[in-house]
Amino acid sequence: MRIADYSVTKAVLDRHGFTFKKSFGQNFLTDTNILQKIVDTAEIDQNVNVIEIGPGIGALTEFLAENAAEVMAFEIDDRLVPILADTLRDFDNVQVVNQDILKADLQTQIKQFKNPDLPIKVVANLPYYITTPILMHLIESKIPFQEFVVMMQREVADRISAEPNTKAYGSLSIAVQYYMTAKVAFIVPRTVFVPAPNVDSAILKMVRRDQPLIEVKDEDFFFRVSRLSFVHRRKTLWNNLTSHFGKSEDIKTKLEKGLALADIKPSIRGEALSIQDFGKLADALKEVGL
């Protein structure tokens, strides 16, 4: 019997008198086939260390621990720590860290792996309410995570992996794909969770690029330009740029020069621009003094 088997999950929760907290976005997976599929998608073996976020009662952790060199699981809910000590008692390659992943000193933590030189993969069922902040925090950290295989709300997975000229494409697609390739591996129906969430989930596989997708003069400015270009999706690029930078004649002249330099039409919408286009635009706007 597995932790994820519904009868086992229910018995564990009843034994420990556990009640779900909405504030932590807790939904526990009760489908062993899906858990095996997650591990297979992540290609976990004895030559990989894994960081898990939000292990819950250890359903995914159990599968990870059977396959990985070591698992470090970050759990914010104090009440789950003794439960994890119970459900994972047979494993000597799991460390449970009772901490918010956004506040953890990851550089120090990863040194606690017995073999810290092994590649690190992030495999997790992320809480819906904080998916994007966690992902961006990890991606932008200086830690060379090789790969992410994470479950999230289907809509967010679609946005992250979206291509230009699609409804889902936006600044989040650009922010992630600048650093990583991103592809939806498979869909997880809401019916396999306790309690069931209101929407379906998706497993997103992201692999870190050897270097960012494009080279830009100023990364912060590049991300700023991409974000502001989607503030009002139905507005043209020109309208979004002037809303942000201003509408004085001097600013307008600089914007016109920058757009001409990047060979981008002012009447286009942000969703039509590729990451490469945004790179050219940001560099051109920087060059004209914005």
Swiss-Prot record:
GO MF assignments: 16S rRNA (adenine(1518)-N(6)/adenine(1519)-N(6))-dimethyltransferase activity; RNA binding
Keywords associated with the record: Cytoplasm, Methyltransferase, RNA-binding, rRNA processing, S-adenosyl-L-methionine, Transferase
CDD domains, A to Z: AdoMet_MTases
Record: residues binding S-adenosyl-L-methionine: 27, 29, 54, 75, 100, 125
Keyword hit for Disulfide bond: no
EC code: 2.1.1.182
Keyword Hydrolase listed: no
Alphabetical list of SUPFAM superfamilies matching this protein: S-adenosyl-L-methionine-dependent methyltransferases
Superkingdom to which the source organism belongs: Bacteria
Gene Ontology CC annotations of this record: cytosol
Compartments, record wording: Cytoplasm
Gene3D superfamilies attached to this UniProt entry: Ribosomal RNA adenine dimethylase-like, domain 2, Vaccinia Virus protein VP39
InterPro entries in alphabetical order: KsgA/Erm (IPR001737), rRNA_Ade_diMease-like_C (IPR023165), rRNA_Ade_Mease_Trfase_CS (IPR020596), rRNA_Ade_methylase_Trfase_N (IPR020598), rRNA_adenine_dimethylase (IPR011530), SAM-dependent_MTases_sf (IPR029063)
Reaction(s) catalysed by this chain's protein: adenosine(1518)/adenosine(1519) in 16S rRNA + 4 S-adenosyl-L-methionine = N(6)-dimethyladenosine(1518)/N(6)-dimethyladenosine(1519) in 16S rRNA + 4 S-adenosyl-L-homocysteine + 4 H(+)
NCBIfam families: ksgA
Family that this chain belongs to: Belongs to the class I-like SAM-binding methyltransferase superfamily. rRNA adenine N(6)-methyltransferase family. RsmA subfamily.
Function: Specifically dimethylates two adjacent adenosines (A1518 and A1519) in the loop of a conserved hairpin near the 3'-end of 16S rRNA in the 30S particle. May play a critical role in biogenesis of 30S subunits.
Protein name: Ribosomal RNA small subunit methyltransferase A
Organism: Streptococcus pyogenes serotype M18 (strain MGAS8232)
